[in-house]
């Protein structure tokens, strides 16, 4: 599974780059261990700065790199106790957030609050039903006279919020000075609408804004302009859109139009009330529901608005509740940031909540909805499936028409994030799920076309780096996506609290976009990286003492072996698995390189078997290290002994005999089959699981499942290795070959076996090792050497700042 490195890649030197702090102990052949000393602080070393030269990054849909040099000019010594206190504090803050998830933490919309403030008391005349909403408006005008998001200026957002608030205050003859200030802002900034990206225009702006203008003209002091070319253009768009609204249909079946009823004329409220949501709202929109209450005096509308106004102390958001949206997106962010392991229990609760509400027609942003959208459905589908819940791919048939997929019924265009999440969901497919294959091809085509046209702008969110996020997904298929690589890039892409969502107005989701998540992710990443650099030092020492270089293993191959292990298993507490994986891979490559013909293979296998003493399978620990013709066999034995000894110290289990048997099985196949031997993946899987303290039941049904998984993974990984060798020989990329080969169907079967829960199932951690190994082989076969060099430099040696 190795590929040749670019000559531009300079390996870090063990002696010059990294050091072990005196409080760290490590065997040259074993895992890193930590020795505590009373009242003394442990430290970690991590590179602070490097000289790098990047050229042609992400060209022709794949990352390329010219890395002239990696060196360390300085080191940062991190106070471990202080770091631990910060990390614990952040984890506790986030746990508190996750335990408090309810209907959604969302910012207030001045526009919607204004509509609520306009409602007249249902039991009185000329009295506001919600005086606290008027209070909120009066208290939340910005210094420039506008209302809206205070941290991001959007002319569309500020204009519609400001006009709505001025109308509300004027309607009740309140705060004339605030109204005047608001109208000055309105007139001075109206022209800015012309220069803004239409993709970032609030939802339904072209219908809602003209309705407000018409209402404002009935209030004399407002003096709204009526001769502006911009306004004329908006009214034309309004008229065009209204002619396309199927009013007959909107009165009969639930559609997204229920979310934007405010200001619309000619509505049959008797029919529309039949489409009301269970909570009394019209598709969870306070402004739409407020308008409905004005027209109908409906008690359920009043009940919904009373609850929301009370919840938000007078103001109301642009949509509420958003419970499903929040639960799903929070889990996605935590997982991609690489910190989900701190919140396993809370994430399980989140997914159980979503699972209870999931329907065969899909979901939307809130529970008990008669309208579904592909964005929330795709995100929920993907996460539910990956967390072992039973969900059918047939759900996506509700979002497909005439060969195309849409976000909502009746929608004409595809939003970038909707297609992006559909693309991500479509990759988690089981055998025979044609609808997901179709969804994958369609969404990929849409996204690639938008990328080529430089149109990766979304109408639902303004985020830090959507083009790079989508580009990563397009260029790195899920089967090849190693966890640590994704996390390293996503930490740079995640905007945290700077990301803004687009509804009827701009809004923020404090529990989805949270600085605490990003801070913990950065701290944890650098902490993990620090340990990885120490382990890389250990691996290099082991490499020198084992003299593997003399048998043909290059340092480049050694680094790739460690990178594949670290990219897949990154957690500090899993050092045994990571080091065992890297050393096993290095030994496999060395043996295959040094022992080439069949006679030598048989001789090597015989020497190994002759050394095995089942009564004392730690014999290798006492073998002399003087150079002999059997040194490679001795290095193998010594490594097995050291790995088993470290595991015994940590978990109290003796795995030496089992490791010998695993190697014996592989050598037996390899001596007769040579390059045709399919057992490398099996050897890695068995050793990783032995080192992980995850023990496999001996029951016949369990063993049958394990054998099937082994056969499947062996076949996949062997074919990927063949593709990789072919790629290296021909000097070409084999990406298309992988995509069009039988590997895809076998990967689908493997995904189903790993992620679909069955009665009396084996431990998921054991099953997931099979998929983890398969992904590492897929990655090595899929990516070219420049891409791998770039990933190694970024993931292992570039500190997150």
Swiss-Prot record:
Gene3D superfamilies: 1.50.10.160, Farnesyl Diphosphate Synthase (1.10.600.10), Terpene synthase, N-terminal domain (1.50.10.130)
UniProt xrefs under Pfam families: Terpene_synth
CDD domains registered for this protein in UniProt: Terpene_cyclase_plant_C1
GO molecular function: ent-copalyl diphosphate synthase activity; magnesium ion binding; terpene synthase activity
Subcellular location as annotated: Plastid, Chloroplast
Cofactors (names): Mg(2+)
InterPro entries found in the cross-reference section: Isoprenoid_synthase_dom_sf, Terpene_cyclase_plant_C1, Terpene_synth_N, Terpene_synth_N_sf, Terpene_synthase-like, Terpenoid_cyclase/PrenylTrfase
EC number: 5.5.1.13
Residue numbers covered by motif DXDD motif: 373-376
Regions annotated as coiled coil: none
Gene Ontology cellular-component annotations: chloroplast
Pathway: Plant hormone biosynthesis; gibberellin biosynthesis
Residues the record lists as binding substrate: 241, 459
Keywords of this entry: Chloroplast, Isomerase, Magnesium, Metal-binding, Plastid, Transit peptide
Chief location category: plastid
Biological process terms in GO annotation: gibberellin biosynthetic process
Residues engaged in binding Mg(2+): 373, 375
Reaction catalysed by this enzyme: (2E,6E,10E)-geranylgeranyl diphosphate = ent-copalyl diphosphate
UniProt function note: Catalyzes the conversion of geranylgeranyl diphosphate to the gibberellin precursor ent-copalyl diphosphate.
Comment on protein domains: The Asp-Xaa-Asp-Asp (DXDD) motif is important for the catalytic activity, presumably through binding to Mg(2+).
Family stated for the protein in its record: Belongs to the terpene synthase family.
Protein name (Swiss-Prot/TrEMBL): Ent-copalyl diphosphate synthase, chloroplastic
């Amino acid at each position: 599974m190795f590929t040749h490195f670019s000559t531009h890649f300079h390996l870090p030197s063990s002696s010059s780059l990294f050091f072990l702090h005196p409080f760290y102990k490590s065997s040259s052949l074993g895992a890193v261990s930590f020795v505590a000393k009373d009242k003394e602080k442990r430290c970690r070393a991590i590179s602070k700065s490097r000289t790098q030269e990047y050229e042609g990054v992400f060209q022709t849909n794949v990352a390329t790199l010219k890395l002239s040099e990696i060196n360390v000019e300085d080191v940062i010594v991190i106070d471990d106790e202080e770091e631990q206190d910060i990390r614990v504090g952040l984890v506790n803050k986030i746990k508190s957030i996750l335990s408090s998830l309810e209907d959604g933490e969302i910012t207030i919309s001045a526009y919607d609050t204004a509509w609520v403030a306009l409602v007249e008391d249902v039991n009185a005349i000329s009295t506001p039903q919600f005086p606290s909403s008027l209070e909120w408006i009066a208290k939340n005008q910005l210094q420039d006279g506008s209302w809206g998001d205070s941290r991001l200026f959007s002319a569309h957002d500020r204009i519609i919020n400001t006009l709505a608030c001025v109308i509300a205050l004027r309607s009740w003859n309140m705060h004339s000075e605030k109204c005047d200030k608001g109208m000055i802002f309105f007139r001075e900034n109206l022209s800015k609408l012309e220069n803004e990206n239409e993709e970032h225009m609030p939802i339904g702006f072209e219908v809602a804004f003209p309705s407000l203008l018409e209402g404002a003209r009935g209030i004399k002091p407002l003096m709204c302009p009526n001769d502006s070319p911009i306004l004329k253009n908006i009214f034309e768009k309004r008229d065009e859109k209204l002619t396309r609204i199927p009013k007959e249909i909107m009165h009969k079946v639930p559609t997204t139009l229920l979310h934007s009823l405010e200001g619309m004329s000619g509505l049959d409220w008797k029919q529309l009330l039949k489409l009301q949501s269970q909570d009394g709202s019209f598709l969870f929109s306070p402004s739409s529901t407020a308008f409905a209450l004005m027209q109908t005096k409906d008690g359920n509308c009043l009940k919904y608005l009373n609850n929301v106004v009370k919840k938000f102390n007078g103001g109301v958001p642009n949509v509420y509740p958003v419970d499903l949206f929040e639960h799903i997106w929070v889990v996605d962010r935590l997982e991609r940031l690489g910190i989900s392991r701190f919140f396993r229990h809370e994430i399980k609760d989140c997914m159980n909540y979503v699972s209870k509400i999931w329907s065969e027609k899909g979901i939307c942003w809130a529970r008990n909805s008669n309208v579904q959208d592909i964005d929330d459905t795709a995100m929920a589908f993907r996460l539910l499936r990956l967390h072992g819940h039973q969900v059918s791919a047939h759900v996506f048939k509700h979002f497909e028409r005439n060969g195309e997929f849409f976000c909502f019924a009746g929608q004409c265009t595809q939003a970038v994030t909707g297609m992006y999440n559909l693309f991500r969901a479509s990759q988690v497919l089981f055998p025979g799920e044609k609808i997901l294959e179709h969804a994958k091809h369609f969404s990929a085509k849409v996204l690639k076309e938008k990328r080529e046209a430089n149109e990766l702008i979304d109408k639902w969110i303004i985020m830090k780096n959507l083009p790079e996020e989508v580009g990563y997904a397009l260029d790195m298929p899920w089967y090849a996506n190693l966890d640590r690589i994704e996390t390293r890039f996503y930490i740079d892409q995640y905007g945290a609290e700077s990301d803004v969502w687009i509804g009827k107005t701009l809004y923020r989701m404090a529990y989805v976009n949270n600085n605490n998540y990003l801070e913990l992710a950065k701290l944890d990443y650098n902490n993990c990286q620090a340990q990885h650099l120490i382990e890389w030092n250990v691996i290099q020492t082991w490499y020198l003492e084992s003299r593997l270089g003399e048998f043909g293993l290059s340092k480049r191959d050694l680094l790739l072996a460690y990178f594949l292990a670290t990219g897949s298993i990154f957690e500090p507490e899993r050092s045994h698995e990571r080091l065992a994986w890297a050393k096993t891979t290095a030994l496999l490559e060395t043996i295959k390189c040094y022992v080439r013909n069949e006679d030598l293979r048989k001789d090597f296998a015989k020497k190994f078997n002759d050394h095995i003493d089942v009564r004392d399978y730690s014999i290798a620990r006492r073998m002399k290290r003087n150079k002999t013709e059997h040194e490679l066999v001795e290095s193998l034995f010594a490594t097995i002994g050291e790995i088993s000894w470290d595991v015994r110290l940590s978990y109290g289990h003796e795995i030496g005999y089992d490791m010998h048997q695993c190697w014996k099985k592989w050598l037996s196949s390899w001596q007769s089959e040579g390059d045709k031997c399919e057992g490398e993946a099996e050897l890695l899987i068995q050793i990783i699981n032995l080192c992980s303290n995850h023990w496999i039941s001996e029951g016949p049904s369990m063993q049958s499942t394990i054998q099937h998984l082994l056969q499947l993974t062996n076949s996949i990984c062997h074919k990927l290795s063949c593709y990789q060798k072919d790629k290296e020989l021909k000097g070409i990329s084999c990406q298309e070959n992988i995509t069009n080969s039988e590997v895809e169907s076998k990967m689908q079967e493997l995904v189903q076996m790993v992620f679909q829960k069955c009665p009396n199932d084996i431990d998921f951690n054991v099953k997931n090792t099979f998929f983890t190994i398969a992904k590492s082989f897929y990655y090595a076969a899929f990516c070219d050497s420049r891409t791998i060099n770039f990933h190694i430099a970024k993931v292992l040696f570039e500190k997150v700042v």
